[in-house]
Structure formats: C-alpha cells, structure tokens
Regions:
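Tubulin/FtsZ superfamily GTPase core signature
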Residues: 1-301
Length: 303
C-alpha cells in the first residue's frame, strides 16, 4: 500500500430521496475525485435513474418500493428498517455527506436517520440540504423545517440552502427545471468545496484533520465560493465568497474558518484575503489557510 493510500480519507456522499439522488447524479457527472457516491430512496423506480455506483432501496417491506408518499414519518421508518444496510455502506468511512431536498417524504424523514447512523459510527457527518420555495405547499415548508431541526441534531455541521435564494441569481425567464438544476449545482459546489480541500494537491496544504477541526460538532455552517481576476483578485474573490447570495448565514462571529485560495496569488494577496475574513469573523476566530492550484475560493464557517 502506498503512503498516499494510507493517508487518504474515505469520503462518502449519500443522496437521500429524489432531490438527493439528483444532486449525486450531478456530482457523478462532474467527476468529483476521491469520493464514493451512494443513492438512497424508497422509490424503486426512481433509483433506476440514480447514477451512483452504490444504490440502496430503504424500507422495502414498508413501502414496497413505491416511495414515501410525501410523508416524512414513512421515510424515517423506512431508514430505520434498513439500519444494518446503512451501516455496511458507511463502514470504514472517515467523512459522510448526507444531501437531500427537505420537504418531501424520503429525504426529510430518512436523512436524519442516515446521518445519525454515521455519527454513531464516529464518522465526521455533514448535512447539505435545500429548503423549499415559499410558493410550495405550506405543509412542505413545515415538514422541511422539522426535518432540518432533526438533521441538525444528527450531524456535525449543517449547510442549508434556501431554494428561494435562487430567485436572486436567475433570470425571470429561467424555467422551473433549470432552477432546480441550479439547486443541484449549488449542492454539488458545497460538497466539492469541502472535498477538494482534502483531496487536491496544494501549495499550502489542508488535510482531513484541518477540516475535522473546523467541522466537528459545529452546527450551522456557511460556505461560499468566489472567482475574480486582476490586481485585487484574491480580495475580490473572498468578498464574493463571504457574501454568497444563496445562503442565509454570515461569517460574523464565526468560531472557525477555512480559507482556501486557488490560483496564482502573491503573499500580499493572501494577506489581504485572510485579513478581510479575520476582520469579519472577529479576532477570536480560528482561521485555517490553504492555497491550491485551481481558480476558486471556498470558505466554510461553522458557527
């Protein structure tokens, strides 16, 4: 076994329910490296569309493969029926992402159970979920809020992306399928922003232990991505990242921050970016800095 194999973290991304499966499909299409993908659903037919190498139909006895009927309690019981299979899938993992769209039956009900299993196994567990549009049924939003609350209790860190925020970044002529695809893209960026920190080569290296320090038992998190070029590219990119229009959180008062800068930057560029974040987060914030070869900035901020 090589040193690289010995030191690499085993990361699993689990998409739960229809929206979670769609998000995983996008990540598979984007060829995110160093990650294993799993699709979980109560709907047997929907699972046939999932591109994850590993798929699991949960609650087979309970739902007969026909889905959760938009009832979170059914999704929850389905996951509980399949606890042993979930444990097998997550065996040996160092980090598990649980992603879903909150408000329906399977994702809302099953995701907290899936996350709870991971956390009980001692795995660093991160939830990345979307919240429904306000124009959707009131029941769907109330289910989502309940699911988010339960999920937060069962993860180390939770990133919540309100679908309503998509309205701030899309054109009025954007179709519903296009908007939902954008939501999948945001979920993918949130996950990839963290996994790239661990898996990709860097000038100033960040590793799994750094991510673990920032994300273990930290609650709600903020993750932003920015891109810029020109004389002040690092500062401009970091300003974009901390003011992400897709999130309800801010980095003010953050206890821990990871700044990961990618691209050709000078020492002064790095200093300007780090100083800007330190001023926003506060002098007590623990800031971990990394520099990569690509062209994005990722900031993760658990409060």
């Amino acid at each position: 076994m090589t040193n690289e194999a010995e030191s690499s973290a085993k990361i699993i991304v689990i998409g739960v329910g229809g929206a979670g499966n769609n998000a995983v499909n996008r990540m598979v299409e984007e060829s995110i490296g160093g990650v294993e993908f799993v699709g979980i659903n109560t709907d047997k037919q929907a699972l046939t569309l999932c591109k994850a190498p590993t798929i699991l139909q949960i609650g087979e006895k309970l739902t007969k493969g026909l889905g959760a009927g938009a009832k979170p309690e059914v999704g929850e019981k389905a996951a509980e029926e399949s606890i042993e299979e979930l444990k097998q899938i997550m065996e040996g993992a160092d980090m598990v992402f649980v992603t879903c769209g909150m408000g329906g039956g399977t994702g809302t009900g099953a995701a907290p159970v899936v996350a709870g299993v991971a956390k009980e196994m001692g795995i660093l567990t991160v939830g990345v979920v979307t919240k429904p549009f306000k124009f959707e049924a009131r029941t769907r939003m109330s289910n989502a809020l309940m699911g988010i609350e339960k999920l937060e209790e069962n993860v180390d860190t939770l990133i919540v992306i309100p679908n309503d925020k998509l309205l701030e970044i899309v054109d009025r002529r954007t179709t519903m399928p296009e908007a939902l695809k954008k939501a999948d893209e945001v979920l993918q960026q949130a996950v990839q922003g963290i996994t790239d920190l661990i898996n990709l080569p860097a000038l100033i290296n960040l590793d799994f232990a750094d991510v673990q320090t920032v994300m273990t038992d930290k609650g709600i998190a903020h993750i932003g991505i920015g891109e810029a070029k020109g004389d002040d590219k690092a500062l401009e990119a970091v300003q974009q990242a901390v003011s992400s229009p897709l999130l309800e959180t801010t980095i003010e008062g953050a206890s821990h921050v990871i700044i990961n800068i990618s691209g050709d930057i000078s020492l002064m560029d790095a200093n300007d970016a780090a100083s800007y974040v330190q001023n926003l987060a506060g002098e007590d914030a623990n800031i971990i800095f990394g520099a990569m070869y690509l062209s994005l900035i990722h900031i993760s901020e658990p409060t």
